[in-house]
């Protein structure tokens, strides 16, 4: 995609970088300069994660030119946020909690134009169905994959490589996940189906001033 302005990814996530690369989007990285990443009080979780992505983009745009892209992902079970595990024992406890259950993955992004100081924020929700897991399944997974840097202690790309992701993909029968409702890329860390139209629209005409959040 040929953008009229350089795209700056304000995220250290290797998964988000992979998604952009897989979809032919050129970018460079800038540091995320938002140091307080707590969700704003009083907002529903989906609104809260959009607000957080917005705050990340605005903070990270300091001294930067072009388009700043930020994102944040929440793994939510029974309205409780599962963050990144602090230890392998913590990871095992998270996967045990997810076993046989359905949880939601909410990812929001904000694309911020540093020239007009305006931006667009979008979010998506994917429902993830976990199989009933035996203790051996959990132990095998946490010792075979890097789980400490992933919210909820799992990565969908470990279960189904992104090169195979499509509408009709088949998840292996022995995988942790039985099926998903919604976007694979959203679970991986960036709802690319929502981002692409925003980028394409931006290349055709300048965004109107004012922050849009829907």
Regions found by a protein language model. Name each.
Residues 1-67, 80-81, 133-136, 143, ...:
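N-terminal polybasic phosphate/anion-binding patch
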Residues 48, 73-103, 130-136:
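Active-site-adjacent loop/tail segments of enzyme domains
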Residues 73-76, 105-112, 155:
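Short beta-strand scaffold segments in enzyme catalytic cores
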Residues 92-96, 108-128:
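Anionic-ligand binding region
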Residues 121-206, 213:
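Active-site oxyanion/phosphate-handling segment shared across diverse enzymes
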């Amino acid at each position: 995609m040929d953008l009229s302005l350089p795209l700056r990814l304000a995220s250290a996530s290797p998964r988000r970088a992979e998604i952009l690369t897989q979809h032919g989007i050129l970018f460079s990285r800038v540091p995320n300069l938002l140091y307080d990443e707590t969700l704003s009080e009083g907002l529903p979780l989906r609104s809260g994660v959009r607000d957080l992505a917005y705050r990340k983009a605005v903070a990270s745009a300091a001294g930067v030119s072009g388009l700043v892209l930020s994102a944040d992902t929440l793994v939510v079970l029974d309205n409780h946020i599962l963050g990144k595990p602090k230890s392998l024992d913590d990871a095992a406890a998270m996967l045990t909690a997810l076993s046989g259950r359905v949880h939601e993955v909410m990812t929001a992004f904000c694309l911020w134009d540093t020239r007009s100081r305006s931006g667009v924020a979008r979010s998506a929700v994917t429902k993830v169905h976990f199989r009933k897991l035996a203790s051996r399944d959990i132990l095998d997974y946490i010792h075979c994959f890097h789980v400490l840097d992933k919210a909820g202690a799992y990565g969908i790309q470990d279960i189904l490589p992104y090169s195979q992701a499509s509408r009709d993909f088949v998840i292996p029968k022995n995988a942790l996940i039985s099926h998903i409702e919604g976007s694979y890329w959203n679970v991986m860390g960036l709802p690319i189906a929502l981002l692409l139209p925003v980028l394409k629209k931006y290349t055709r005409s300048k965004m109107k001033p004012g922050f849009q959040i829907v």
